[in-house]
Amino acid sequence: MCPEEALELSEKIQKTVCSTHEWGSAGNINIYKSTGNEVSTKILVHDAELHSDKVIYYPTPEPKDNVMDVDLVIVPGVVFDEKMARYGRGGGYYDRFLDQLPKRTCIIAIAYDYQVLSHRWKLKLNEFDIKMDMIITEKRIIQKRGTLNYKE
């Protein structure tokens, strides 16, 4: 994918995140700083900075005590399946972090649609892997209760 297309798709994904109830109702948001080929998070950070009721936290290797106050987590990943499973970069950082969160915390993965395996494929998870509540791509929102496809 060329850089221009990646930027366009990243913007679409982020605008979709900003339009969700989960984003609108979240006060404390943990969000990754995008690098390389990951979906950009610049629009999300900017949107949160415009709203005084939102506080942004960035992931750290040793999460602070405020982890219990997080309403929403935006996570990256390498590949996902439609059953809400996620493979990251293999270090287990996010799974350890997500496991500490209260059950009420919403976990949203943002990804390009090509990163999501079709329903015929399923990622093999281990006991430590944490499933997402929602996966948002440029084409659809995948939720535990079903998929919303965008009209092209």
What are the roles of these predicted feature ranges?
Residues S34, V78, R140:
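Flexible loop residues that form catalytic
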